């Protein structure tokens, strides 16, 4: 009976408590606890964010709170924090006691409340350069400036999953780590700095919003709107995503978007106005600096026009010899290529156009090397601006007049071409080269004729004024002028007139550079012979000086040598008179210091006696040679004298011309003995010298008489200079006769040798 009773009791117990009822209870308990953790997750996240942004900042609870304080402390997720104020509890009701399948996302916004902005102040934002940018003014339309936006959301799983017993403590520990990182990050964000900067000035506000509802930016400056407009590529905001917490019911996520600028401050209206003025001044200054005149950013049109002529020119090649000549070029007209009013390219002193318009030629027959050196000098000076920045290319841009006839001195450089406009009377510098000095001719008369008629700067510049110092009593300058007065070295073929010069300038310059170089190479043997002759002359000169040293007298000067040679010539004349009764007195002047500069005279025979005397006087005046160094003419007959050294005396016979009432009468033949050392192969050509005309202006006739007339017109200003030249010749003759009377006999005839084959004409 007792056993039956026990079996009945066990059956009743099993009927009230089935085997699966315990498992279901445990499952429901786990789901309820996980749901509570998810709900507290939203609350705890809002509490951490609001505590770091809200006013006043709550104090950290103590480790051993009292019973009253413990009731106000939130201990969830192992973070002891003061409970959320009652004002915010109503906003959090939406996330309490709600089904997880319908729980909405939570949005927490932190903003600057502009409603309490003082009337006399303005909220500004400072950029990286500490320039203020106006954010909002008092009583404006914008009442809020959004600084950051937090998003807390839960994504439920689409499939049902069983909550495991060990899952709850794992998810809880993951949430603890996440909240601790958020707690530290909220105090490192820009909004926390804004809270410190605007403390007791402007409060920060917070909003808890339903993430399922649209967010309106009306009446406030939204998070997506930039305040500083200078940023082009980089954004004014950034986003941060935290590590999510995964559960069997769903995933918990937290992210934030915030402004990177935090330099918000309040400025007085007057202070802001002055700062705006200062900022505008700085911007204008930067614009002026960027648009100011510089060698790289100045007038593009000027740069194009000034560089365009250079592109059409071949590469510049420097001539191997510093050969200069004075040639007359025909007038060439060219339109102006500059634009008035443009700024200068470089900050250099302006150069007058009269000095820029001078073309420099290398050869006397207007060969192509004329244009090559002229192009070289123009390119070298094209970057130097004048007042109107006009690059000169063989033209006068203003008046359209012809280009002035060019000249070149013995320097072969730009020193003699460009004249300083501040000092118009500066003496030009000369650098002589003995190898090429015989190829130059310098005439102040032709320079006077070649003065340009107009100036780019509106000034009356003159070549005469620029070269007025050429007549100074300078021994070196006189020596150079004497050298430059001799005949020119011809590089090319026969001479051509003005039309030939124009034709040669239009030919390619590079081919003529090669021709000039070949011509110089062909003259190597002659220059070698010239060098040997100079060396021999120096040796003879040393012998002569050693012979004179026996007299215990110092080295003779130019005048002493001149007097000595006059004595030698007197002795020579006495010997001639004793040998032949028909021999007349013959005088010769020898320039001991620079006698070899008379070489390289080409054969030419003047056909008129007037032209002979005119040529002598013009050469003396153009070179500014003193009477003691001029080549005089004396009455007599030529004679031959044998000498032991290579010294040359060229006898030039002519007739003395005198005019009375327009009638010309011829007197006895005159003979000029030009003495000089044998320094050139042309000296040994025993023919009467003929002076080649190198100043060809017209090519109508090629006869010698017309060439002589044209040369006379260029070297003189008129026929009236003939009489003055005759008077000067007479004075020189008197001076020579006086020296002959005072001279004594001298047996030393080392430096005297006459031309054996000279003849009268």
Curated annotation (Swiss-Prot):
Phenotype caused by lack of the gene: Reduces the formation of biofilms. Significantly decreases the resistance of biofilms to fluconazole, itraconazole, terbinafine and caspofungin. Leads to autophagosomes with shrunken membranes with undefined edges. Also results in partially dissolved contents of autophagosomes.
Molecular function terms, GO-annotated: protein kinase regulator activity
Expression induction or repression: Expression is induced during biofilm formation.
First-listed, main subcellular location of the protein, grouped into a coarse class: cytoplasm
Subcellular location(s) of the protein: Cytoplasm; Preautophagosomal structure
Biased composition (Polar residues): 344-367, 400-411, 445-456, 614-631, 721-730
Keywords associated with the record: Autophagy, Cytoplasm, Protein transport, Transport
Domain of life of the source: Eukaryota
Single biological process term from Gene Ontology: protein transport
Gene3D superfamilies in the record: 6.10.140.1900, HORMA domain
Record InterPro entries: ATG13 (IPR040182), Atg13_N (IPR018731), HORMA_dom_sf (IPR036570)
Function of the protein: Plays a key role in autophagy. Activates the atg1 kinase in a nutritional condition dependent manner through the TOR pathway, leading to autophagy. Also involved in cytoplasm to vacuole transport (Cvt) and more specifically in Cvt vesicle formation. Seems to play a role in the switching machinery regulating the conversion between the Cvt pathway and autophagy. Finally, plays an important role in biofilm formation and resistance to antifungal compounds such as fluconazole, itraconazole, terbinafine and caspofungin.
Protein name, entry field: Autophagy-related protein 13
Protein species of origin: Candida albicans (strain SC5314 / ATCC MYA-2876)
Gene that specifies this protein: ATG13
């Amino acid at each position: 009976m007792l056993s039956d009773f026990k079996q009945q009791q066990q059956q009743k117990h099993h009927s009230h408590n089935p085997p699966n009822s315990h498992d279901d209870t445990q499952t429901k308990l786990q789901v309820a606890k996980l749901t509570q953790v998810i709900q507290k997750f939203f609350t705890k996240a809002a509490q951490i964010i609001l505590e770091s942004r809200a006013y006043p900042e709550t104090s950290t609870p103590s480790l051993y709170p009292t019973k009253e304080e413990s009731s106000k402390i939130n201990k969830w997720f192992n973070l002891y924090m003061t409970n959320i104020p009652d004002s915010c509890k109503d906003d959090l009701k939406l996330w309490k006691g709600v089904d997880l399948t319908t729980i909405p996302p939570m949005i927490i916004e932190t903003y600057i409340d502009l409603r309490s902005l003082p009337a006399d102040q303005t909220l500004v934002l400072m950029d990286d350069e500490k320039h203020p940018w106006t954010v909002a003014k008092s009583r404006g339309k914008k009442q809020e400036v959004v600084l950051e936006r937090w998003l807390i959301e839960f994504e439920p799983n689409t499939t049902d999953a069983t909550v495991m017993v060990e899952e709850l403590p794992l998810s809880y520990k993951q949430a603890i780590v996440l909240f601790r990182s958020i707690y530290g990050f909220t105090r490192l964000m820009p909004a926390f700095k804004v809270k410190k900067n605007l403390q007791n000035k402007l409060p920060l506000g917070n909003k808890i919003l339903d993430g399922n509802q649209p967010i309106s930016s009306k009446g406030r400056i939204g998070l997506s709107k930039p305040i500083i407009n200078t940023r082009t590529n980089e954004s004014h905001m950034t986003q941060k995503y935290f590590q999510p917490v995964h559960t069997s019911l769903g995933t918990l996520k937290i992210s934030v978007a915030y402004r990177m600028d935090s330099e918000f401050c309040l400025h007085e209206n007057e202070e802001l106005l002055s700062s705006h003025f200062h900022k505008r001044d700085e911007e204008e200054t930067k614009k002026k600096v960027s648009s100011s005149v510089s060698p790289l950013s100045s007038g593009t049109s000027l740069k194009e026009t000034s560089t365009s002529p250079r592109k059409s020119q071949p590469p510049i090649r420097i001539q191997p010899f510093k050969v200069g000549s004075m040639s007359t070029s025909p007038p060439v007209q060219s339109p102006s290529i500059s634009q008035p009013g443009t700024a200068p390219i470089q900050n250099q002193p302006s150069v007058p156009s009269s000095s820029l318009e001078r073309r420099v030629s290398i050869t006397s027959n207007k060969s192509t090397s004329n244009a090559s050196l002229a192009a070289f000098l123009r390119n070298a000076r094209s970057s130097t601006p004048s007042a109107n920045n006009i690059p000169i290319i063989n033209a006068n841009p203003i008046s359209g007049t012809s280009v002035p006839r060019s000249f070149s001195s013995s320097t072969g450089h730009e020193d003699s071409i460009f004249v300083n406009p501040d000092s118009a009377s500066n003496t030009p510098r000369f650098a002589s080269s003995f190898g090429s000095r015989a190829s130059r001719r310098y005439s102040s008369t032709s320079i006077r004729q070649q003065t340009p008629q107009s100036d780019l700067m509106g000034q009356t510049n003159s070549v005469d004024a620029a070269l007025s110092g050429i007549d100074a009593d300078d021994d070196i300058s006189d020596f150079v002028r004497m050298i430059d007065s001799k005949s020119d070295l011809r590089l090319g073929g026969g001479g051509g007139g003005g039309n030939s010069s124009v034709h040669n300038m239009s030919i390619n310059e590079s081919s003529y550079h090669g021709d000039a170089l070949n011509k110089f190479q062909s003259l190597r043997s002659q220059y070698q012979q010239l060098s040997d002759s100079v060396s021999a002359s120096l040796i003879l000169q040393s012998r002569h000086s050693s012979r004179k040293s026996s007299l215990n007298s110092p080295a003779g000067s130019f005048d002493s040598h001149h007097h000595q040679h006059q004595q030698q010539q007197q002795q020579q004349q006495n010997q001639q008179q004793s040998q032949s009764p028909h021999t007349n007195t013959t005088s010769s002047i020898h320039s001991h210091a620079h006698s070899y500069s008379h070489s390289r005279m080409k054969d030419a025979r003047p056909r008129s006696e007037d032209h002979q005397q005119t040529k002598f006087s013009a050469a003396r005046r153009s070179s500014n040679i003193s009477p003691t160094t001029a080549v005089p003419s004396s009455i007599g007959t030529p004679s031959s004298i044998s000498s032991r050294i290579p010294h040359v005396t060229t006898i030039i016979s002519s007739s003395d011309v005198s005019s009375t009432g327009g009638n010309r009468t011829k007197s006895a033949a005159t003979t000029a003995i030009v003495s000089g050392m044998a320094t050139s192969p042309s000296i040994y050509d025993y023919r009467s010298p003929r002076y080649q005309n190198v100043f060809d202006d017209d090519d109508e006739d090629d006869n010698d008489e017309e060439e002589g007339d044209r040369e006379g017109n260029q070297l003189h200003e008129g026929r009236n200079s003939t009489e003055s030249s005759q008077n000067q010749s007479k004075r020189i003759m008197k001076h020579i006769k006086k020296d002959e009377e005072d001279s004594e006999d001298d047996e030393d005839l080392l430096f005297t040798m006459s031309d054996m084959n000279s003849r009268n004409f």
